[in-house]
Amino acid sequence: HTMTTNTIHIKAPGCWMNDPNGFIYYKGKYHMFYQCFPYGPRWGRMHWGHAVSEDLVHWEHKGIALFPSKRGDRDGCFSGSAVEQDGKLYLYYTGVSYLLEDPEDTNLCLDDQFVSAQMMITSEDGIHFDNIKDKREIIAPIGEREMGDAAHTRDPKVWRGEDAWYMVLGTHGNDGNGRLLFYRSADLENWSYVNAVSKSGFGWMWECP
């Protein structure tokens, strides 16, 4: 290792890395996913990198877990979370589709011209993810401006409540304030809207709730 190489922190094998995603203890190991662009040292169409550890100190990279492959996430797999149910690993994330690409750089869009859908994928072992067969869109892009923003609604956090599974999303209200959207599910696949929370003075979009 060189003096500038991390030895006890997760670092992408190369290129770009940002948000940690889907941290979970599953089948005897800690799993950490993270936003990455594996084609250059810059932001681009987001993928999910994947690393595992038995002690939270020594990490082994498992390559790319999620990559753009469906209409709902063709331009990026944004941040999200992970849960386990009946031995299966569930990953939830925001898929992005550009409505207007930057003609000078197709990894970017122009003027926030994109929409965001909420996606899920499952794995039986936490290592192999079939990005073609096992992805599905669970919440379509927001269609009612009073509810949220079709572009800036993202970063699903899923957890088990006393009576059901719950999800919270960060979004941007039509009043210019940040907003949280709450959803509920009995089976981790079919989600229904519950309510929203908003407050002025705390930013225009509440990312990564």
Per-region residue spans from a language model:
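Beta-rich carbohydrate-recognition and catalytic domains
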Residues: H1-C208
